[in-house]
């Protein structure tokens, strides 16, 4: 698997986690499933002696169809991921950040990590408007399909 494809796959999975939010239910935050798509727009690889780091920037779209009332159905985001691979291009893990200004003007910021299995763990770290009360919400996810050039679809579930 190419470094770009591996990096894109994990990077997308990473910040795809961004779309998973939560709703209040019985006084507690409750999460829901979400789906996202990632299309890489740029990448840069820095090679070391024992591995490489690939930085990937992508434009993502999140399906919030299961989100609480008042949240938009579709949200666009810009994601930045750093993926570490060994000398053979095998994924070791990475980190990512996604930022979004939704159609209503509300802002959300997500951070995530992922391991060599491609499973990512993400957190909504900060938000305004409808996202403000959801800061700290956690979710997990992975890719469900990917194109040869690195774009893909991922699925998220609340933790």
Please name every model-derived segment:
Residues 1-10:
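Bacterial N-terminal signal peptides that target proteins for export
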Residues 11-13, 20-23:
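Cleavable N-terminal signal peptides
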Residues 24-159:
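Beta-strand-enriched cores of mature, soluble protein domains
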């Amino acid at each position: 698997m190419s470094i770009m494809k591996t990096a894109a796959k994990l990077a997308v999975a990473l910040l795809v986690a961004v779309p998973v939010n939560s709703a209040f239910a019985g006084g507690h935050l409750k999460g829901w499933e979400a789906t996202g798509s990632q299309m890489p727009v740029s990448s840069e690889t820095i090679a070391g002696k024992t591995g490489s780091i690939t930085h990937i920037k992508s434009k993502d779209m999140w399906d919030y169809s299961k989100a609480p009332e008042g949240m938009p159905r579709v949200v666009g985001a810009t994601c930045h991921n750093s993926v570490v691979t060994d000398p053979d291009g095998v994924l070791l893990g990475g980190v990512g950040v996604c930022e979004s200004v939704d159609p209503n003007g509300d802002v959300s910021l997500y951070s995530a990590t992922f391991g060599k299995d491609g499973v990512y763990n993400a957190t909504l770290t900060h938000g305004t408007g409808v996202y403000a009360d959801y800061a700290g919400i956690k979710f997990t996810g992975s890719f469900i399909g990917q194109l040869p050039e690195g774009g893909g679809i991922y699925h998220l579930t609340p933790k």
